[in-house]
Amino acid sequence: MAEDDMVSLLFKLKVEDVTCSDDPEKHMKNASNERKPLIEPVENQLMDIGEEGGSLDYWLLYLYVDCLTMMCCFHRGSLPYNWMQGALLTNLPSYQHDVTLDEVNRGLKSASDFFGYVDPMRSDYFTAFSFPGRVTKLNEQMELTSTKGRCLKFDLYASTQLRFKPGELVRHGECKFAIG
């Protein structure tokens, strides 16, 4: 069903100001070279979360999903089932610079036993929520190993109420974990 929605959005997409080029390969390389500094992490770079917008005074929980699911959350106002009892969220921030995406996937898979976390591409996006009093803190924690070998622990939360209010989804985007 979500795939049908995305396909219908693509059919409605209008592309304007397209010109024909005699050397598309050259333009593709130029575009790729311009994009590289934007996507390649710099050693020991910390993300300035102030750039994300919004107040940082409230408590945030993160849901790690693929791009399509993130967009469905954003447009439909509902959480996906990614756990046997609803939605599994964590307080692991999406810009944790000393944890790799593979390690996050390993931790989420062991915590949730959800098949979706086998492939790192299924969780390289996030949605961040502010749920005052709507989630249950689980007794277990997600244990991750940092890139420096330290053990990091993050709390896990469950939500059986999958619909959320528009103001509760406060951020969404691509994860900024360490490369490794």
UniProtKB/Swiss-Prot annotation:
MF annotations from Gene Ontology: beta-glucosidase activity
UniProt protein name: Cytokinin-beta-glucosidase 1
Signal peptide: none
Keyword set includes Hydrolase: yes
Keywords linked to the UniProt accession: Cytokinin biosynthesis, Glycosidase, Hydrolase
Summary of the function given for this chain in its UniProt record: Hydrolyzes cytokinin glucosides thus liberating free cytokinins.
One BP annotation, GO: cytokinin biosynthetic process
EC number: 3.2.1.-
Coiled-coil stretches: none
InterPro entries: Glyco_hydro_41 (IPR006065)
Keyword check for Hydrolase: yes
